[in-house]
């Protein structure tokens, strides 16, 4: 009996570690928290594309900024005039060697059409993520907390 319990513990250890490690990733569904209201503002699904870099798409939006359109009228690239729902707002980014941090990509604010460099850092065991948008240096940016959506 002791041998089978020990075997179960030894065999399940790697599975539990793999599950915990998988959570320390930006992949999955996230909801940004609106700074003004403190409420969720959207659902964004982050996956990897064929190149192995991050891609994030808005699945749903709940809060629209005053005067904002359901389309990205202020975008200056291929997203100009396209609906924000279903829009790819995260492009690029890879995991830094030896760290649970993803960088090198861009994130779009569809309310004003501005694009920023972005850094993703899972926190709280992967239940939350710090998303830092910046121009130039990460020190010159703004961090928003996103919450993982379990579905």
Q: Which sequence ranges carry the predicted segments?
A:
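N-terminal helix-cap/turn-to-beta initiation motif at the start of protein domains
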Residues: 18-29
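Exposed loop/turn and edge beta-strand positions of beta-sandwich/beta-sheet ligand-binding modules
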Residues: 24, 40, 140
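Edge beta-strand at a domain terminus
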Residues: 126-128, 134-151
């Amino acid at each position: 009996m002791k041998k089978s319990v020990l075997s179960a513990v030894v065999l399940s250890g790697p599975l539990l570690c793999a599950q915990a490690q998988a959570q320390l990733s930006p992949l999955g569904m996230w909801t940004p928290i609106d700074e003004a209201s403190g409420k969720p503002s959207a659902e964004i699904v982050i996956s990897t594309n064929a190149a192995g870099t991050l891609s994030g798409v808005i699945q749903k939006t709940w809060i629209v900024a005053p005067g904002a359109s359901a389309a990205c009228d202020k975008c200056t690239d291929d997203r100009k005039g396209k609906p924000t729902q279903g829009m790819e707002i995260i492009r690029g980014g890879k995991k830094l060697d030896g760290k649970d941090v993803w960088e090198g990509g861009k994130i779009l604010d569809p309310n004003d059409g501005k694009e920023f460099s972005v850094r993703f850092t899972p926190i709280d065991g992967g239940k939350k993520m710090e998303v830092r948008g910046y121009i130039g240096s990460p020190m010159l940016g703004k961090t928003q907390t996103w919450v993982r959506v379990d579905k």
